[in-house]
Amino acid sequence: MKQILYKLFEHQYLGRDEARTILQNIAQGKYNDVQVASLITVFLMRNISVEELCGFRDALLEMRVPVDLSEFAPIDIVGTGGDGKNTFNISTAACFTVAGAGIPVVKHGNYGATSVSGASNVMEQHGVKFTSDVDQMRRSMEQCNIAYLHAPLFNPALKAVAPIRKGLAVRTFFNMLGPLVNPVLPTYQLLGVYNLPLLRLYTYTYQESKTKFAVVHSLDGYDEISLTNEFKVATCGNEKIYTPEGLGFARYQDTDLDGGQTPEDAAKIFDNIMNNTATEAQKNVVVINAAFAIQVVRPEKTIEECIALAKESLESGRALATLKKFIELNNK
């Protein structure tokens, strides 16, 4: 590791194979916590390259516990995290909204590393038992239209670095990797990122894959569509900037999206959204993220039509019914 760190300190970049080997060594416990933290710190000081990101991703996918749910052609909706905003669980709520609209979802999530509550915290608050049983996940897809994959069960490297990430409490390149290594390798993905260089990096990375995707970024730094500012959406062949007002929404304040101080606070906000009793800001932010996810799967629909489908899922109670059925099936 010493030679690797010296190389990085001299502002050199890792090759794809080199990055792959480093991640494999981390997963196998060949480096101590201080060495891993030093490596992580380098990538806090500069942007990661496409080659480095692809190499890290190669290692994680090679070591993953594979899950074949390809018959469902599902979508994952995920943010990188690490934007420092402590929002409520927007992408998780959007997942159940999309599933309620009839589109299969495989949510790949983890505990919060830089926020109060990650997707796995919300699931635990609802009594969900995490599993790597593929048959159980297939039943969940068949009966609920959604399955949840707790990342550490499927990737030893993510589990190995979890205490270090929690101790640092800042975004790391593992925030960037999490969305790229859903063990299902979903057919579709909506990914939120916290800055424009990362939006371009993910767009280049996804263009090398078979995944149909959209990468979103709010220009004031959110790793999802926040409706607090203009936002950019990048797909395989297009980039476009939208305004909240142009899509019929108000422009909200940062405080409108606050996730609370505890996992219990975050779970309460999540429940309010599912019960259609949330604030206008909370509801509409979930709707707009769900809408762009729906459009990834159904590109023939206009974004206005997708917004209507997302609203209907929440307002009709179908998103809530999906959540209740999911909890019932997955808390045993």
Curated annotation (Swiss-Prot):
Stored Gene3D superfamilies: Nucleoside phosphorylase/phosphoribosyltransferase catalytic domain, Transferase, Pyrimidine Nucleoside Phosphorylase, Chain C
Pathway the protein contributes to: Amino-acid biosynthesis; L-tryptophan biosynthesis; L-tryptophan from chorismate: step 2/5
Ligand binding (Mg(2+) 2): 223-224
EC code: 2.4.2.18
Organism phylogeny: Bacteria, Pseudomonadati, Bacteroidota, Bacteroidia, Bacteroidales
Signal peptide stretch: none
Name of the protein described by the UniProt record: Anthranilate phosphoribosyltransferase
Reactions the enzyme catalyzes: N-(5-phospho-beta-D-ribosyl)anthranilate + diphosphate = 5-phospho-alpha-D-ribose 1-diphosphate + anthranilate
Job of this protein: Catalyzes the transfer of the phosphoribosyl group of 5-phosphorylribose-1-pyrophosphate (PRPP) to anthranilate to yield N-(5'-phosphoribosyl)-anthranilate (PRA).
Binding site for anthranilate 1: 79, 110
Keyword Glycosyltransferase among UniProt keywords: yes
GO molecular function annotations of the record: anthranilate phosphoribosyltransferase activity; magnesium ion binding
Cofactor: Mg(2+)
Family assignment from sequence similarity: Belongs to the anthranilate phosphoribosyltransferase family.
Residues reported to bind 5-phospho-alpha-D-ribose 1-diphosphate: 79, 82-83, 87, 89-92, 107-115, 119
Class of this enzyme: transferase
InterPro entries, per database record: Anthranilate_Pribosyl_Tfrase, Glycosyl_Trfase_fam3, Glycosyl_Trfase_fam3_N_dom, Glycosyl_Trfase_fam3_N_dom_sf, Nuc_phospho_transferase
Cofactor binding notes: Binds 2 magnesium ions per monomer.
Domain of life: Bacteria
Cellular-component GO terms for this entry: cytosol
